[in-house]
């Protein structure tokens, strides 16, 4: 993974963890957890693609990888919708910047996961 992406994930997660949104903190904690899981999934998928010999073993070992991939895209779409929802409600510039950057990062990660998945197919 590119070091800028790692920094972006860490920066966004750190800033989100310090926020107190008007919505419940449970919602924000859920978003943070999903961001962390998405980062781990993206990293592992990218590593599998980089080790071309592992592609066939990944497909053989994990017959449900396409289902997992579909689930991750659903999670990304949910996170994008949540970020957009927060952006429409907040007037706090710190929150706006954080969630705009989170939205941009989600779109980049979605594109990268699509690229990785096409290489796996």
Swiss-Prot record:
Entry keyword set: Host nucleus, Host-virus interaction, Transport, Virion
Major localization listed first in the record, in broad terms: virion
One Pfam family named in its UniProt record: Flu_NS2
Localization annotation: Virion; Host nucleus
Gene Ontology terms: biological process: exit of virus from host cell nucleus through nuclear pore
Superkingdom of origin organism: Viruses
Gene Ontology terms: cellular component: host cell nucleus; virion component
Motif range (Nuclear export signal): 12-21, 85-94
Cited SUPFAM superfamilies: Nonstructural protein ns2, Nep, M1-binding domain
Subunit and interaction comment: Interacts with protein M1. May interact with host nucleoporin RAB/HRB and exportin XPO1/CRM1.
Membership in a protein family: Belongs to the influenza viruses NEP family.
Miscellaneous comment text of the record: Average number present in a viral particle is estimated to be 130-200 molecules.
Purpose of the protein: Mediates the nuclear export of encapsidated genomic RNAs (ribonucleoproteins, RNPs). Acts as an adapter between viral RNPs complexes and the nuclear export machinery of the cell. Possesses no intrinsic RNA-binding activity, but includes a C-terminal M1-binding domain. This domain is believed to allow recognition of RNPs bound to the protein M1.
HAMAP family referenced in this protein's UniProt entry, alphabetically: INFV_NEP (MF_04067)
Protein name: Nuclear export protein
The organism's taxonomic lineage, starting at the top: Viruses, Riboviria, Orthornavirae, Negarnaviricota, Polyploviricotina
